[in-house]
Amino acid sequence: MKFSIQKELVDVAGRRLGRAGMLETPHGVIHTPAFVSVGTKAAVKALTPEQVKSLGAEVVLANTYHLYLEPGAERIKSFGGLHKFMNWSGPIMTDSGGFQVFSLGAAYGKQVSKVANQKNLRALPASGLRRDEDFFDAAPSLVKISEDGVSFRSHIDGSLHYITPEKSIEIQHNLGADIIFAFDECTSPTEDFRYQEEALERTHRWARRSLEVHKLKVNSKTQALFGIVQGGREESLRKRSAEFMASLSPPAGGFDGFGIGGSFAKEDMETAVKWVNEVLPKEKPRHLLGIGEPEDLFM
């Protein structure tokens, strides 16, 4: 994968406001900034691949968790990978499955999304950042998180599964997307600082493990691996995470790009992006995970 900046916007003080670039993958070029069409189960809902392309989409994102459960990464590999399986000749991204850990765990049954709004956050006590045990214990969790990985029960049939950073990378290699993501823990926007920090450090250890196993795979020559910046709504944690991911990503190695992961309040999204953009290496691409509403495109 090769990324080149074609144009940069700067203000009178020399601060970077935005940029346009070209991301070259084995299946074509992505012109950035780009909206990534979501094809959760290897298909964009209600559209054929030809229609998706005719609308100007250059890249589609498929969901690792859902494809792992149905029809299975090995089966997709037997078809020749995602591109042949979904009849899409352009670039494909797959996420790590980290958001599904969140949706089956901290958010399960609580109507809290990874990008919260003020209505969600009003569920917190007045101090705003204390963990509200009644709120978090009000619904069951289908997930158990440990240092090694995550155990969870399928939302389809209740069967027990276990995913580690190494297994997430293996699944994504079998799927064969052009851009894949390191395994991470996506926390709730309503978690307190203590847990956000604990999860952040775990995500960093998982990132290192994801990168190490990726380097051993033959596919690492053709698949780009992005590390994910976490840290919730905390500036210090966001910047710490960006610094850590950058430290694993020298210009000629390490992560090929970065995802900016949830969670944060929608009202804080622009600020959170600015925090990490000040730290992440300029020469590598970034992807803002978990957005998609029209107003999100005009931060």
Region spans (language model):
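Non-catalytic, usually N-terminal nucleic-acid engagement modules in DNA/RNA processing proteins
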Residues: 1-217
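Glycine-rich phosphate/ribose-binding loops and adjacent secondary-structure elements
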Residues: 201, 213, 223-299
